[in-house]
């Protein structure tokens, strides 16, 4: 078994079942729709049909990035198991999530000095981001090391 985990954001544009099958945990962005905040949990809290029906009826969604505290809560269980983390974020050009991830990384590196956390700015979104995650999972599944996957 690899001593690292590859993680991403829910904005990766891949289905929940695919991410679970490929063992790619994801941290949820959040959005507000009709005054109610939802986690972007890939259709668990609200189905895509309901989501798009609300938009068709005039609702306007707003989104919020993952903050550093959410990253800490998301990553800490992996670190407690002794796993290094390779996390790929949504492009820093359209979200502050990369900066939040870097703040969490610095905090957790002090708490877990013997483990590695690498944060990669995908510089992409949607399908391009998803393809990158699929490629990284392929490398990991072929037995590539943490450092090789990061490179």
PLM regions with names:
Residues 2-3, 21-22, 113-116:
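A short helix-to-beta-strand connector/capping loop
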């Amino acid at each position: 078994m690899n001593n690292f985990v590859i993680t991403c954001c829910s904005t990766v544009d891949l289905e929940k079942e695919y991410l679970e099958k490929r063992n790619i945990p994801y941290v949820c962005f959040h959005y507000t729709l009709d005054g109610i905040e939802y986690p972007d949990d890939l259709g668990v809290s609200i189905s895509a049909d309901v989501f798009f029906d609300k938009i068709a009826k005039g609702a306007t969604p707003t989104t919020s990035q993952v903050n550093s505290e959410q990253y800490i809560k998301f990553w800490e269980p992996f670190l407690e198991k002794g796993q290094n983390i390779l996390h790929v974020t949504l492009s820093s050009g359209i979200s502050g999530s990369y900066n939040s991830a870097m703040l969490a990384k610095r905090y957790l590196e002090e708490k877990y000095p013997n483990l590695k956390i690498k944060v990669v700015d995908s510089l992409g979104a949607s399908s391009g981001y998803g393809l990158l995650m699929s490629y990284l999972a392929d490398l990991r599944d072929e037995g590539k090391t943490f450092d090789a996957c990061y490179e």
